[in-house]
């Protein structure tokens, strides 16, 4: 089935998942929506996160997508269960895949989780980890400065190193062997996070495991794309498209052109 896969995020972070989808499923076409105008979602009230996420979901459904990936940990924590109940197409989040990936690699069963305020306060990762491995010990930390850094294209340099080091300081005394990057923005800071946290801690991003789950669901539902299909990915951003295009082009390693999307109106539209 040559309909597109819909991928949504509060901003550019979901591109880390989209890149893995493109790598593992090269014949599948993606429609990406990043709500860069209203990013970050983490500090927002739950009802606001729910409203904004449903606006993106409704837009993607109107585009005729065959499957939706909520490539935002905060939105996954708030909306995934509800979306699965209400929609007739498969919907995948990024928390369960991230938890499974962490349990696969940990030896000590001591796992750290970093994420947005909402994701950490929801305890979604702790629940998901304990569902997979009941003996796991989890230490979580909210990292509010990280998403604004990524959205403003600041992913390296002395200032970023300083911010990351100061933010992660409470975790440095925790004896863990695995750290979940519990926000899809955070892999863009992975090099800096890795230097701060040390070489003995494995960093986990949910992109790879999420793509595996998407592949399995496409096969199970008989909706995989034709193998001779050449996809033309489509990108939408609610904020500054030039900034989005710059970050997306760097991360995806190919030129990206984005359409401006207006959400929150009676009829979502591209401008």
Swiss-Prot record:
Pfam families: Asp_Glu_race. It catalyses: L-glutamate = D-glutamate. Gene3D superfamilies: 3.40.50.1860. PROSITE patterns: ASP_GLU_RACEMASE_1, ASP_GLU_RACEMASE_2. GO terms for molecular function: glutamate racemase activity. Its EC number is 5.1.1.3. SUPFAM superfamilies: Aspartate/glutamate racemase. Keywords: Cell shape, Cell wall biogenesis/degradation, Isomerase, Peptidoglycan synthesis. InterPro entries: Asp/Glu/hydantoin_racemase (IPR015942), Asp/Glu_race (IPR001920), Asp/Glu_racemase_AS_1 (IPR018187), Asp/Glu_racemase_AS_2 (IPR033134), Glu_race (IPR004391). The keyword Isomerase applies. Pathway: Cell wall biogenesis; peptidoglycan biosynthesis. One of its GO terms (biological process) is regulation of cell shape. The keyword Ubl conjugation does not apply. Substrate binds at residues 9-10, 41-42, 73-74, 184-185. The active site is at 72 (proton donor/acceptor), 183 (proton donor/acceptor). Belongs to the aspartate/glutamate racemases family. NCBIfam families: glut_race, PRK00865.1-3. Provides the (R)-glutamate required for cell wall biosynthesis. This is Glutamate racemase. It comes from Exiguobacterium sibiricum (strain DSM 17290 / CCUG 55495 / CIP 109462 / JCM 13490 / 255-15). The gene is murI.
């Amino acid at each position: 089935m040559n309909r597109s896969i819909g991928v949504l995020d509060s901003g550019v972070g979901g591109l880390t998942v989209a890149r893995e989808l493109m790598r593992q499923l090269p014949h599948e076409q993606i429609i990406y929506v990043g709500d860069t105008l209203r990013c970050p979602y983490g500090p927002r009230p739950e009802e606001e996160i729910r409203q904004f996420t449903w606006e993106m979901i409704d837009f993607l459904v109107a585009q005729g997508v065959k499957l939706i990936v909520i490539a935002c940990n905060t939105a996954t924590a708030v909306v995934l269960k509800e979306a699965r109940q209400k929609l007739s197409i498969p919907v995948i989040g990024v928390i369960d895949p991230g938890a499974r990936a962490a349990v696969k690699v940990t030896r000590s069963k001591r796992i750290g989780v970093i994420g947005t305020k909402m994701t950490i306060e929801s305890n979604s990762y702790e629940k998901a980890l304990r569902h997979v491995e009941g003996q796991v010990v989890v230490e979580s930390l909210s990292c509010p400065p990280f998403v604004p850094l990524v959205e403003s294209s600041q992913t390296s340099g002395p200032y970023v190193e300083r911010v990351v080091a100061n933010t992660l300081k409470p975790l440095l005394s925790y004896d863990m062997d695995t750290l979940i990057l519990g926000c899809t923005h955070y892999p863009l800071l992975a090099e800096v996070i890795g230097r701060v946290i040390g070489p003995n801690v494995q960093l986990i991003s949910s992109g790879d495991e999420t793509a595996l789950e998407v592949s399995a669901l496409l096969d199970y539902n008989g909706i995989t794309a034709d193998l001779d299909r050449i996809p033309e990915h489509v990108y939408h951003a609610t904020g500054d498209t030039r900034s989005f295009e710059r970050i997306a082009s760097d991360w995806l390693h190919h030129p990206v052109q984005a359409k401006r999307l207006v959400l929150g109106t009676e009829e979502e539209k591209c401008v």
